[in-house]
A protein has these predicted regions:
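Helical "lid/coupling" subdomains associated with nucleotide-phosphate turnover
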Residues: 12-287
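Short glycine/serine/threonine-rich phosphate/pyrophosphate-binding segments
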Residues: 3-9
Length: 287
C-alpha cells in the first residue's frame, strides 16, 4: 500500500509478481479538503475503502506500507513503545499497535509529539487523517502483520532497470561485499574465512547461513575504531547501517555476532535494550 499526498495505491504481490493494482483518492491532502469536517472525511474514507475491498478481494497476508505518512505513523509508534532500534525499514506493527498509537496521538497532541520526534510539520499535520485511513484499511483487509518499507518509487524504478542476474542477488550479501571492499584491511578475506568456518555450521537453516556469511564479510570493517570501542562500533555497523534484506531481529543477531568477534562478554548497557529483542536461543547462537 503506497500513500502519497493526494492518492493511495494498492497492489497485490505474490511469488515476486505484481497482481491486481488499483488507485484511489485517499491521500491525506485530498481528504483534508473534504466538506463536512471530520464526519464528512470519515464517510468519504469509509466509502472509498469499501470500494477498494470489493475490487481487491480478501487479503490476509502481510501488508507492506510505503510512503511518508505511513513512516511518520511508524516513527510515532516507535516513540510510544520506546522501541530501541531506530531503523524504519522492516519495522513491524499490529492492529493493536496502530490503535494504541492513535490514542497516544489524541492524548498527547501533535505539538508535543512534534517537539519530541523529528518529523516535519507538514508531515505530522497529516498523521491524524492517515492513521484513520490505515485503521479502516486494516479492519477490512485483516493482514496478519504490517511491515514498513523505506523504499519507494525511486528504488522500484532503479530495480526495473537492473538485469535479471543482478535482481537475483542477495541484497544483504551484496551490501556486505561492498562494505568489505571499501573498509576492510584485506578485502576478499571474508570469503576465505567463511569457507574455513563453514564445516562448523553444516546443519543450520538457510536464513542463518546467510547471516554467517555476512558476519564473515563484515568481520574486519570496523578495524579503524579505537580498540576500547571496536566491539560497540561493530554492533552499530550492523544495526544502523544501510544493509538491505534484513529483519530487525536479524540486524541485532548480526550485530551481536560481530560484537563478540572482539569481546567475550558484553558490558555495554546501552546495547541491552536492543539485544533484549532477541530470544535467549538467538543470543546464545549469535555469541
Amino acid at each position: 500500500c503506497d500513500i502519497g499526498g493526494a492518492s493511495m495505491e494498492l497492489a497485490e504481490i505474490s511469488n515476486g509478481e505484481v497482481g491486481k493494482r488499483i488507485t484511489s483518492s485517499l491521500g491525506p491532502l485530498s481528504i483534508s479538503g473534504i466538506a463536512g469536517g471530520k464526519r464528512g472525511q470519515k464517510l468519504f474514507i469509509s466509502k472509498i475503502l469499501d470500494d477498494l475491498h470489493v475490487q481487491m478481494g480478501s487479503q490476509s497476508d502481510r501488508l507492506f506500507l510505503v510512503g511518508g505518512s505511513w513512516r511518520a505513523i511508524a516513527r510515532i509508534d516507535m516513540h510510544r513503545r520506546g522501541y530501541p532500534l531506530h531503523v524504519m525499514h522492516e519495522y513491524r506493527m499490529t492492529f493493536k499497535d496502530i490503535h494504541k498509537t492513535d490514542e497516544y496521538i489524541k492524548n498527547y497532541g501533535l505539538d508535543r509529539i512534534k517537539s519530541e520526534i523529528r518529523i516535519s510539520s507538514e508531515r505530522i499535520d497529516l498523521v491524524p487523517i492517515a492513521i484513520q485511513i490505515l485503521k479502516g484499511l486494516i479492519r477490512r483487509f485483516k493482514p496478519h502483520d504490517i511491515a514498513i518499507s523505506s523504499y519507494g518509487i525511486r528504488e522500484g524504478t532503479l530495480y526495473e532497470q537492473m538485469p535479471q542476474i543482478m535482481r537475483d542477488r542477495d541484497p544483504l550479501i551484496e551490501s556486505c561485499h561492498f562494505a568489505e571492499r571499501k573498509d576492510a584491511r584485506l578485502p576478499g578475506f571474508g570469503m576465505r574465512l567463511h569457507k574455513f568456518i563453514l564445516p562448523i555450521f553444516n546443519n543450520i537453516i538457510p536464513e542463518r547461513a546467510r547471516l554467517v556469511r555476512a558476519a564473515c564479510l563484515l568481520h574486519d570493517v570496523s578495524w579503524r575504531a579505537h580498540p576500547d570501542f571496536r566491539a560497540e562500533t561493530c554492533f552499530d555497523y550492523a544495526t544502523r547501517s544501510n544493509l538491505g534484506g534484513l529483519s530487525h531481529n536479524e540486524r541485532i543477531f548480526l550485530g551481536l555476532a560481530l560484537l563478540h568477534r572482539y569481546r567475550n562478554k558484553r558490558n555495554a548497557r546501552q546495547l541491552e535494550p536492543m539485544i533484549s529483542l532477541l530470544s535467549s536461543d538467538d543470543k546464545k547462537e549469535a555469541e
